[in-house]
Each structure stands twice: as structure tokens, then as C-alpha cells.
Amino acid sequence: MPLSLRSFGWPLVGAAIVAVAGIFVQEPVTDALTGEAVADAGLAFSLGYLLFAPIGAVYDQLSLVTDRQHIFILVSLVVLYACARVWLGLSGRLPSAGLWRRILRESGLGAAAFAGLLAFYAYGVLGPRPMTALRADDPNLVIVDFHSHTEMSHDGRPGLSALDRRAWHDAAGFDLAYVTDHATVETDHAILEAAEAALADNPERAGERLSLLPGREVRFEGQHVLVLGTSDPTAGILESEPWPVVIQTIPNNLTRVPVGGPDGRGGVQGIELVDADPRAFRQSTEERDWILALADSLDLVMIAGSNHHGWGRAAAAWNLVRVPGWREMAPEGVGRQIEALLLRDRAEANRVVERPRLAAALPGEGPARRAWMAVTALPRFGWHILTSLTLPERLAWLGWILLWAAWPLALSPALSPRPR
């Protein structure tokens, strides 16, 4: 087939869209409280990630949408496929066949397309792939995750060991991660043993590599809360014991946040501003003002939690805690300093930074606005991906488009060797 401008039409359109989206680029990492750009930390990408940047960007952003946005995107893709098949049929571009043959053909193709979509989603949840990491420019900043799980939690991915926990957090750029498995009577002893084994595998100095620290997720006053610094679910019950750092998690009923007494016992000292559960993404958006009001009125430190149970390969947010000289300290000592800072300085002790997420409808918006946000979820999601790309990612996308454009050249008879 001779080459023509039409052969390069779609690659040119794709390259133009990717390039134009760069004019409207979003900050790759922002302060979750103020929305301002982060000057002392940024995203880092491995060569493996950049080689497959288009797939990585789609999977990353799919990991950052709410539960309802997942539904809107999936339904939009199904409707788009159905409309495309109807248009092809009406325009005479499909092979002619009898009614029952057409029904069987379209049913089979539709089932295959839907299975392919589910397989794409499933790989994003279960499959291995390079991760986007955060790197801090200030050597005194510790990048922390306060909320994560292993297979010891009833809803943790089977086989998710402490070794896997280290690998995931290390790939995401964390320095320290609290393992906060759910406390149950059946698993208490096993969790304590696993925590001891994880601590034993920590480096001597925290700056050498990622360290795991103990914690628990327990039910307290009808709420799911995190207890930091100990794997003992009874910590702080006795008056003779110090009250540990307790963090209110989301999603939860935030009208029932446990409030401590004058001595600080019996309540929480912090609350999650960002949690990577899709339901929590929705709550943190819809109830953001309430979370901020709680943090202000109760003097709570706001934190981020990956809440990672073994599904997916993207971190939504990171905590930046300033601990001078932490790299030369023992990991447990760094943990104690962080916990002391959270108790003493509260809001000043921690800074949450996050990746940009697709805008969601807010509770005060009218039905028309909410319907518009649902109907346009798919195109807005595509544009959001393109505007959230960093320069290295955008160049990688353009490289793939260049390969796409070069493909017709490779197949062109004009470039094939001619017989003599």
C-alpha cells in the first residue's frame, strides 16, 4: 500500500493532543492541605517505568479515582463500545449476515471486549510493574506511610509478606512504613511474631534502606483507628502505660471521632486527610471541610495512609516528617521521634503531599452538575492523564507515537528491497 498523509493522520493527531496537554500541565505533586506545589520533593521514574509510560500512567491514575468514578468510567466504556458497533453496522462497514448470525457475532465480540476490559483492570490490581516514587531533596525529611497491611489482615492479599511490604514501599519511595494489620483474636499472636520478624530485618541505620515499624488497626469507640509504635492491641489501656499515637481512619463515620480527656487519653491525636481506598477518596473529597474542621477544633495532625492491602502498584500520597539526622539513627529511634513529634506538634509535625486526582462532584452541587460529572468522567479522565504527565513521561508518550507513525514505513513496499 503506498504511503500517504492519511497513513500518519492518527499519529499526528495523537502527538498534537499530547503536546497541547503539556500547556495545561498540572503540578505532579502538591501539598494536600494547601494545593500548592512541593518544592523540596518530586516524582522519580525508573527506566522500566518510562519505557512503558503510557500504560503506567493509565494504571496509576486508575488507582487514584473514587469508587463511583470507577463505575462511571466502566459504564462509559461499555456505552462507547456499543455506540461504535451500532455506527459500524448502520454505515455498512460490518459484514452482512442474517439476524441470528449478527446477534451471535455481536454477543461474542461484546463478551470478548468486556473480558478484555476486566483483564486490563485485573492486571492493574494484581500484575507486577514499575512504580512511581517520591524523592525528597532535603536529607532531613523522612518519607513515611502510617497505614499499611500484610496477609495477616483478614482482607490482605494472600501471600503478602513483610518482604513484599518492603518491596512495595521501597518502590514507592518511602523511607519508613508502619505495618498496621487488623487486630483479631485469631491473629494476635501471629501478628506479634510477624512484627518482631519484620523489625529484626530492619537495617542498623534508617538511611540505609526502607524500614518497617509496628502498628495496629483496631476498633475503638466504634471506629477503625490506627495505633502507632506497637503491635499490642491493648497498648495504653492501663493507666500506668502511656497513651499511644492513635489516628482516625477513613472511610468512617466522622461524627463519632473519639475525643480524649484533658490528659489526652481515650482519644485520637490525628486523622487521615488522604487514604488510598477508593471509598476514602470519595469521602475525603466530599467531607474535606469537615475533616479540616475536626483537625482544627480537636488539634489533630493530618496524615496520609496508603491503606495498601496488596492490590495495585501506585502510591497516592506521602507524609513528610522533619527529623534532623534520622539517616544515622536506628529505625526504631526514628519511629519514636516521629511519634513524639505527632503528639507534641500535631499539625506542625507532618506534611501530606499527594498526586493530582480526577475532580469529583461535591455534595453541595446540583443534580445537573453531578450528572455532568458522571457523563463526562471518561473524557475528563483521559484529559486528566495527559495533563498530569511530567516532562519525562510526556517525552516517552511522544516516543511511542513516533514508533506508531514509523510502523507504516516499515511495512511500505517502497522500502522493501527490489529484485534485480
Where are the regions that the model predicts?
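Charged catalytic cores and adjacent phosphate/nucleic-acid-binding surfaces used
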Residues: 1-146, 163, 167, 221-231, ...
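Active-site/substrate-binding loop(s) of hydrolase catalytic cores
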Residues: 214-216, 222-236, 245-252
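Metal-dependent catalytic neighborhoods of phosphoester/phosphodiester hydrolases
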Residues: 156, 184-200, 225, 259, ...
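Active-site mouth loops of central-metabolism enzymes
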Residues: 148-160, 247-253, 359, 363
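Anion (oxyanion) recognition and catalysis
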Residues: 170, 206, 240-242, 292-296
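N-terminal carbohydrate-binding/catalytic regions of secreted carbohydrate-active enzymes
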Residues: 153-155, 160-192
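Short acidic, glycine/proline-enriched helix-loop-strand junctions
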Residues: 186-212, 291, 300
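Active-site neighborhood of phospho(di)ester-bond hydrolases with catalytic His/Asp-centered motifs
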Residues: 143-150, 174-185, 211-217, 246-251, ...
